[in-house]
């Protein structure tokens, strides 16, 4: 398959050298006295050298996605007798999600765990998996991701130099606000709501009457503190673990979108490895996906207890019809090219989906 590679400037190459040379002192990556060879698209692999791959992750070390990434690295290390080591950098050490996607594309980082909201520029069809109020529940979403359709999307960016290794879940996204409760779509009018750095998500929130403000996840709490935004939208475990309830104590469980995540890898780096090593990495990634799903379920239970303890005001819409009506124009703007795919997704949800 023909690859479309983008040239890398000297600054990016220099950054890659620095990343390779700097060892992680926080215990996040493998520490070994033996020689470790870094693989990148412009660095040939030494036949007998060990290989260091870098994986970027924006979550804190105790987040389910982070623990799953660590598990992935552990499996690869064990199954290659320590010959291939994946060093995981948590807490946005290597940049925010949007930055790390580009770095994986360029080859200055080998892997990243990212929301697919940041991948639609590589394949617009990924929007079909993110449409508002599409899934009945989490089980419905996982049936889609584990189907042939999900496999197709993991492979859909290969011509852009990126391979999706596996899926991670990220729950359902809900609104939370600092000044007033959200009981209906009308309550969102003119509220400044933080969204992911995605034009699609800006349109989703904009059609619901709010003023979307795109910003990195790491900046949300400070913006809530200084009044730069009136609220945000995210899954409730992230809302709890980040402490956003201190500044935004009102949340409505409207579950407007479920946006899966991917562990992605630079395709050219992967192809430098033997077929056996490629298979090992793909299988380990798949097993980390299963582990992440288990961890996420437990994480939801733990973080819900946090919200109960601090007394967050949680509302449940009796009827989501009003919210669904508000986002109908999103389907007109984005869904028409993917009507067959959306129909297939709905069918996987069973009656009423």
Feature-to-residue mapping (PLM):
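Signature of the catalytic double-stranded beta-helix
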Residues: 143-155
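C-terminal motif of bacterial Sec signal peptides marking the signal peptidase cleavage site
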Residues: 18-21
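Bacterial N-terminal signal peptides that target proteins for export
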Residues: 1-9
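N-terminal secretory/targeting leader peptides
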Residues: 23-139, 149, 158-353
């Amino acid at each position: 398959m023909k690859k479309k590679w983008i040239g890398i400037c000297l600054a990016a190459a220099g950054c890659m050298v620095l990343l390779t040379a700097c060892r992680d002192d926080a215990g996040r990556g493998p520490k070994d006295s033996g020689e470790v060879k870094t693989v990148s698209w412009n660095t040939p692999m030494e036949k007998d050298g060990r290989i260091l791959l870098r994986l970027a992750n924006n979550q804190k070390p105790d987040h389910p996605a982070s623990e799953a990434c660590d598990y992935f690295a552990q499996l690869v290390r064990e199954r290659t007798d320590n010959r291939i080591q994946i060093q995981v950098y948590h807490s946005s050490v290597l940049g925010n999600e949007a930055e790390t996607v580009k770095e994986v594309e360029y080859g200055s980082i080998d892997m990243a765990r990212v929301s697919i909201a940041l991948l639609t520029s590589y394949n617009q069809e990924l929007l079909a998996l993110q449409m508002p109020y599409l899934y009945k529940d989490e089980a419905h979403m996982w049936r889609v991701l584990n189907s042939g359709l999900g496999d197709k999307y993991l492979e859909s960016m290969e011509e852009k130099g990126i391979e999706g290794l596996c899926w991670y879940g990220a729950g359902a996204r809900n609104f939370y606000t600092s000044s007033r409760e959200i009981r209906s779509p009308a309550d969102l009018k003119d509220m400044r709501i933080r969204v992911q750095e995605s034009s699609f998500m800006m349109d989703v929130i904009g059609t619901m009457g709010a003023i979307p403000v795109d910003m990195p996840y790491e900046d949300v709490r400070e913006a809530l503190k200084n009044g730069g935004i009136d609220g945000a939208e995210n899954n409730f475990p992230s809302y709890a673990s980040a402490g956003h309830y201190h500044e935004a104590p009102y949340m409505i469980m409207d579950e407007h979108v479920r946006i899966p995540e991917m562990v992605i890898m630079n395709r050219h780096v992967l192809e430098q490895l033997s077929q056996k090593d490629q298979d090992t990495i793909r299988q380990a990634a798949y097993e980390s996906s299963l582990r992440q799903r288990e961890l996420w379920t437990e994480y939801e239970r733990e973080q819900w207890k946090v919200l109960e303890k601090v007394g967050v005001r949680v509302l449940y819409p009796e009827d989501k019809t009003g919210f669904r009506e508000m986002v109908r124009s999103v389907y007109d703007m984005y869904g028409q090219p993917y009507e067959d795919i959306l129909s297939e997704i709905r069918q996987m949800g069973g009656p009423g989906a």
